[in-house]
Amino acid sequence: MSAEAAAIAAHAVVLQSDARALTECAERLHEIEARLEAGGLAPPWLREAVNAHLVACVAAAADLTTAAAHLRRYAERARS
């Protein structure tokens, strides 16, 4: 494997790791959102803020997963 292909593949691994971290963050935010909803005491703006961050984490995780897949394919082509 060329050094360039190895570097590209390494970036893909980092992006996928970041995507997993964001997915885990979204899961934690979902749990927080459920507890806030069940408690019924949190102001609507707090639930909305938590939900906005949850949605952002999900979107970012999807984007990073897509970027990692593109980098993996690019690394494969760079190896040839």
Give the predicted meaning of each segment.
Residues 1-80:
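N-terminal secretion-targeting helices of virulence/extracellular proteins
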